[in-house]
């Protein structure tokens, strides 16, 4: 069971009929704990018909496909979400699934982020055009003019 001190954010699907991304904040990832949290996240994702699971810790962020239960991308949160490629091979390979690619592909979709104004990646997201910080820590990409 996921403890209350971890954030789980959901929007009403009627209000936002778009892709759902689950957020879970954990203090650290050990393989055992990581697997446990992903299993729990995927259970919630299936119940909510979520497409992706996003797991955030102070050191890294991982985005998983809820349907295949396979990783899509990983970012090093300590460096403001610069692609973290040690586990995922070359930077070129990762860049296809990098934050820039994700935000450009999901023009009309919502991505959930931790509701914390002090984290360094907020400005990076704004520079990428991912602005419009909404309630519950959600940010949405600006529509193309």
Task: List each language-model region with its residue ranges.
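A structural signal for short, well-ordered beta-strand segments and their strand-loop junctions
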Residues: 53-57
């Amino acid at each position: 069971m996921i403890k209350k001190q971890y954030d789980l954010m959901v929007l009403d699907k009627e209000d936002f009929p778009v892709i759902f991304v689950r957020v879970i904040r954990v203090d650290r990832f050990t393989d055992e704990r990581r697997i446990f949290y992903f299993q729990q996240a995927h259970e919630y994702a299936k119940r909510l018909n979520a497409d992706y699971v996003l797991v955030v810790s102070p050191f890294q962020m991982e985005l998983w496909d809820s349907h295949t239960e396979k990783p899509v991308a990983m970012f090093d949160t300590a460096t403001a979400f610069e692609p973290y490629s040690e586990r995922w091979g070359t930077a070129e390979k990762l860049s296809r699934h990098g934050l820039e690619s994700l935000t450009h592909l999901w023009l009309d979709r919502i991505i959930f982020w931790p509701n914390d104004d002090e984290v360094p990646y907020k400005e990076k997201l704004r520079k990428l055009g991912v602005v419009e910080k909404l309630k519950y820590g959600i940010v949405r990409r600006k529509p193309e003019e």
